[in-house]
Amino acid sequence: MAENFSWLHRGIAEVFPQPTDAESDIESLEKRLATTDRPLRVKYGIDPTGADIHLGHSIPMRKLRGFQDAGHTAVLIIGDFTARIGDPTGKSEMRRQLTEEDVKQNAQTYLDQVRPILDFDTPGRLEVRYNSEWLSRLDLGKITELLATMTVGQMLAKEGFADRYKKENPIFLHEFLYPLMQGYDSVAIEADVELGGTDQKFNIAVGRDLQRHFGQKPQFGVLLPILIGTDGVQKMSKSLGNYVSLSEHPGQKYQKLQGVPDVLLKDYFELLTNLPIDALPENPRDRQMLLAWEIVKQYHGEQAANEAKEAAQSGGKEGAVPEFSLSNVSQFPVKLAYLLGATGLCKSTGEGKRKIQEGGVRLDGDRISDADTTFQQPDELQGRVLQVGKNKFMRLVP
């Protein structure tokens, strides 16, 4: 009986190489999966360039879980080295370089957020690797060898570089290293498959070329769609405000998701859930509510999903996130550590300071690491959500 690969094909944009009938000598990914005598090594890399992961980032993670459930080994690469360069893909200017401490903090919060998605428990199903393990050891000779595998013309054909070159915006030489370093990750972990968004095809193809260069069998590329944000127009992005963060309060998640435009619902169900598409409710409003409930359940459990639904149906503001009035603060400027004690999120200002230093405090999803963070005026805080740990939230209101 032919193996069912519906889990593989759901919600993907492209698998490459994909042999045609005239290329019967080229192996397909389905054939490799069906005939392999060992678990395939399936790579997904993520650079910890910020504190948050949103639902758009979860799409390749969910596909990675699909490979795990099929018996293969997910190799999650934390790009602690490449994050300090920054992926130039789709960027019109050079990215700010991060400090080692920035990257370390972000990496830990990424792992915390993906635990509900990936199988961390079954032996042999997950490797978490940091690419500084091998990239930090490259000497000038090896770097020269990597650079010699590509031409400047090939690099300038990459969309982001091509646009910047045309507009005479600067392109720095270290940025040319990024695709080569991502590609070398595939060599270092001997990847059989690499997952990425549709914007990563160039980088994944570089990995295939480098594997050939180093005598390895080239990996397959599995490209996944870029998720459109809750505005229904542009790709999901924190900077555009059209995102749903994995670390958000269940009520906030529910509120945002029940407002997803009708035209996007099928894509959201296909990419973010395992529900059968042909069994969805006909009424768009019912589909929105089911989507919101299902995704909150995935990350917070059924009870939290039911509570968020009930709060939304009863008109609960932002899913009943508790509120604290800033009028209770006797004077400004005010330190964040004091505010944590005043809101009851921490027992005291001292505990608030310790929580900040430990990396356990967020404001609107952004990790705060400076214990002396101070706010000059109430309007800097109005409407924002303070978070301590995973489950304590407080909305700041006038």
UniProtKB/Swiss-Prot annotation:
Q: Which GO terms describe its biological process?
A: tyrosyl-tRNA aminoacylation
Top-level division of the source organism's lineage: Bacteria
Report the residue ranges where the short sequence motif 'KMSKS' region is annotated in this entry. 235-239
Extract the HAMAP family matched here: Tyr_tRNA_synth_type2
EC number(s) on record?
6.1.1.1
Specify the taxonomic lineage: Bacteria, Bacillati, Cyanobacteriota, Cyanophyceae, Nostocales
One Pfam family hit: tRNA-synt_1b
Spell out the reaction equation it catalyses.
tRNA(Tyr) + L-tyrosine + ATP = L-tyrosyl-tRNA(Tyr) + AMP + diphosphate + H(+)
A GO molecular function assigned to this protein is: ATP binding
Q: What is this protein called?
A: Tyrosine--tRNA ligase
Q: How does it assemble?
A: Homodimer.
Query: Which cellular component appears as one GO term in the record?
Result: cytosol
Q: Where is the S4 RNA-binding domain?
A: 334-398
Q: Which organism is it from?
A: Nostoc sp. (strain PCC 7120 / SAG 25.82 / UTEX 2576)
| Positions bound to ATP | 238
Q: Give the UniProt keywords, A-Z.
A: Aminoacyl-tRNA synthetase, ATP-binding, Cytoplasm, Ligase, Nucleotide-binding, Protein biosynthesis, RNA-binding
Q: Where in the cell is it found?
A: Cytoplasm
